């Protein structure tokens, strides 16, 4: 009887430890996956000869609600449809230095989660981090350089503050 009880206790203990370790390992894997998760497109930025004319043309012919920075598209987040998300569309002057060191006429902004941890992971992987993380009321930003030399903007958004800023500027979103 004592031997059977000890065997059952040993099996139960092994099962519990195994379950606990699996949970810890799975959680770490989930955290690592989450750390690198791009949640969407935060912005499309491109060079043009005359940003004002470009904004006017897109407003007139395609109905974009433009402001001094371009247009903001409002959408609902897939993971939680009660939350809004935003994507910025911005024409830049062809002489802008903002896209440097890239020589391309465009830059894409990706929405991400946990920017600090992501940057640390990217550093370990040898990805070129072009600058330091900057923090604004509406989110955190950093630039990286991809494999073809394109400057890429990573944004951990604060959508609530971003929406407030848009309202303060009198900007309407394109839906």
Identify the meaning behind each predicted range:
Residues 92-98, 162-163:
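A short, acidic/glycine-rich surface segment
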Residues 35-39, 45-90, 124, 140-142:
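Core segments of cupin and vicinal oxygen chelate
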Residues 77, 93, 156-158:
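Residue-level signal for short segments within beta-strands and strand-turn junctions
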Residues 62-65, 109-111, 131-134:
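Short linear motifs in intrinsically disordered
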Residues 1-32:
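Bacterial Sec-dependent N-terminal signal peptides
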Residues 22-49, 68-69, 96-175:
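Vicinal oxygen chelate
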């Amino acid at each position: 009887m004592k031997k059977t009880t000890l065997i059952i206790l040993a099996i139960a203990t092994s099962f519990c430890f195994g379950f606990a370790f699996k949970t810890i390992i799975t959680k770490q894997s989930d955290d690592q996956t989450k750390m690198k998760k791009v949640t969407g497109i935060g912005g499309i930025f491109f060079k043009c000869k005359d940003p004002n004319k470009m904004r006017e043309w897109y407003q007139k012919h395609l109905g974009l609600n433009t402001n001094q920075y371009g247009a903001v598209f409002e959408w609902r987040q897939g993971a939680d449809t009660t939350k809004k998300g935003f994507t910025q569309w911005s024409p830049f002057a062809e002489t802008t230095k903002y896209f440097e060191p890239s020589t391309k006429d465009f830059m894409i902004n990706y929405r991400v989660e946990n920017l600090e941890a992501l940057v640390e992971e990217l550093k370990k992987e040898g990805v070129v981090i072009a600058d330091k993380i900057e923090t604004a009321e509406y989110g955190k930003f950093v630039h990286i350089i991809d494999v073809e030399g394109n400057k890429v903007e990573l944004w951990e958004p604060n959508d609530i503050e971003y929406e407030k800023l848009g309202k303060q500027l009198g900007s309407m979103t394109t839906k």
